[in-house]
Amino acid sequence: MTTVARLRALVVLLIVVFLVGFVLVQALEPDEPGSGGTVPVAGDTTTLPGDTAATTAPGDTSATTTPGGNLPPLQEVTLELVFDGLRQPLALTAPAGDDRLFVVQRVGVIRILDENREMVDPAFLDLTDRVLAGGIEQGLLGLAFHPDYANNGRFFVYYTDKEGRRQLSEFQVTTTDPNRADPGSERVIIEREQPPEASDIRHYGGNLVFGPDGNLWVSIGDGADSRNQGQDPNTIFGTISRIDVDGDDPYGIPADNPFVDGGGAPEVWAYGLRNPWRFALDPTEGNIYIADVGHAHQEEINVVSMLEGGYNFGWSDMEGTRCFHQPDCDPADYTQPVVTYLHNDQWTEGEPHPPGLSITGGYVYRGSEIPEIQGTYFYADWVEEWIWGFKFVDGQLTEHEDWTDRLGGTVGQVNSFGIDGHGELYLLTHGGQVYKFSAVR
């Protein structure tokens, strides 16, 4: 080979080496900070985190695409028993991202189930020295962790005290043990006697939920004083109320509460409720789901925008869709429920929904383990022990159906539903069991 030919070959070899090296560097070089990888453009079919490119309904055998890859086909959704032996559990929750479960027992004790679903001893908080749990609707009723719990250790409980008063209080976790709260750290936020004409043991409400606005939402029953409470927005009884626990002592009033400038108690966000035992906020769609326990005829679920307020749900002028204390009422004057079902003695064959006597409101499923049921709201009847669900999309009720058999049959009286720190759904039974909604694939 001539000298010129050798030089030409060397030049070609150097060019090839340079090009290969450039391609490898580009392939291995990370994206710019904050870029998050490839950003889809119009017409791109890339799945973003949080999106579900394809889902299957129960019974469908096609695969489900999630950010982590393809899930095997969903065979069924079941209720998986994760713990047994609690004393009348009424609420289950956890700080965001936490692997533990915090379970409220009516007697006045909060227990922790660790990541292996073993009970942690001693209890997280024991308030049996100050909680009255005599009547079936009394006791330690609600729990919510402050949105910044990881940094400030603050949480809130709702209970009936030894005098039968409603008590909303703040506590703090100890600085030395994340599994122990300080019972001496109590700061009373709201304390109310039962209304003058109320029952001593009934209609306390008691659900606590922090909204995406950082405010604490509270359900408060009418005390079984239906003629004096439900239609009076100047009292917090029979309402969903909303307060700012980071505001003035003992609490502040959100500037956009509907009665902040008058016309009702400033804490009140909505009224006309009997005993809203459980409600749920769904920030994804911007709705609040309120399950209100009925009196003589109907149980009901109200779904409205959580961005507004001032709703009057009708009690006690109305019960569900029927006039009650006001026989000539005009339903157009009140916000109407999206779901009602009749009590046993009102029900007749052919009704589209089974009868019941006491609704237990649940949550909209927004977890990641069962994307096929995303957006489904679940609820139960405490007496009849069935479980139903529906979706509420663009103001319309869809996929309203019986889930009892699909979940494996009845599990007993459902006291409450719960959400863990990762958005997965649970239910609690009067018999002391904790069940998780789980996928079989």
Report residues per predicted region.
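Beta-propeller domain segments
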Residues: 104-107, 138-140, 148, 223-401, ...
